């Protein structure tokens, strides 16, 4: 009987990166790592520039040297498309969408969730997904789909701190952790003050 396909959801943050490292270290089946890049417009990535450089110049080449195939997904729509698009239903129909709201980000749904869902529909039945959720994130672990989603961090007893240290020791810790404890687009409405400060100080072209 042929084994199911195994994929790792990978943002190239510490938890998903550590998941891939654990899979390789323990001989867990892994067919590919899947990354979805949100775009600001057709040319500019939504990733903080340091993280995007890390992904394409360090992380993806490292995974490929390990024998891990990396799939990069992008939505047809960009942040600018959504910002300038018009609402098509409801009492605000016809109005320009403009800025995304905290806790209700259309960019997350249209530019990340949908391309991932489309890709998942192309996978064979029974595909198993590794997700980067640490042992000390119990609320998130409880939401995993039994049998279809697996946390290798939980399986091998790794906390978020352990994941950070594993990536650091492997030379695969994103530089964004120097100024933030989370990943996210540089235009994210949920960005914390240190992230906004970093953007203003180091990427004034994006701030403007």
Show which residues each predicted segment covers.
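Nucleotide-activated chemistry modules centered on ATP-dependent adenylation/adenylyltransferase
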Residues: 1-208
């Amino acid at each position: 009987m042929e084994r199911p396909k195994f994929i790792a959801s990978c943002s190239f943050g510490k938890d998903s990166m550590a998941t891939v490292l654990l899979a390789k270290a323990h001989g867990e089946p892994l067919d590919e790592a899947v990354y979805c890049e949100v775009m600001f417009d057709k040319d500019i990535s939504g990733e903080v520039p340091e993280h995007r450089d890390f992904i394409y110049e360090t992380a993806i080449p490292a995974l490929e040297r390990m024998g891990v195939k990396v799939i990069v997904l992008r939505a047809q729509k960009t942040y600018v498309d959504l910002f300038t698009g018009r609402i098509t239903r409801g009492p605000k129909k016809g109005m320009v969408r403009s800025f995304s709201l905290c806790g209700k980000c259309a960019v997350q749904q249209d530019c990340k969730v949908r391309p991932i869902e489309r890709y998942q529909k192309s996978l064979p039945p029974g595909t198993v997904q590794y997700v980067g959720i640490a042992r000390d994130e119990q609320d998130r672990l409880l939401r995993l789909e039994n049998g279809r989603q697996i946390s290798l961090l939980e399986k091998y007893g790794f906390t978020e701190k352990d994941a950070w240290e594993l990536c650091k020791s492997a030379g695969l810790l994103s530089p964004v952790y120097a100024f933030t404890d989370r990943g996210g687009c540089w235009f994210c409405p949920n960005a914390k003050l240190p992230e906004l400060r970093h953007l203003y100080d180091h990427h004034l072209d994006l701030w403007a």
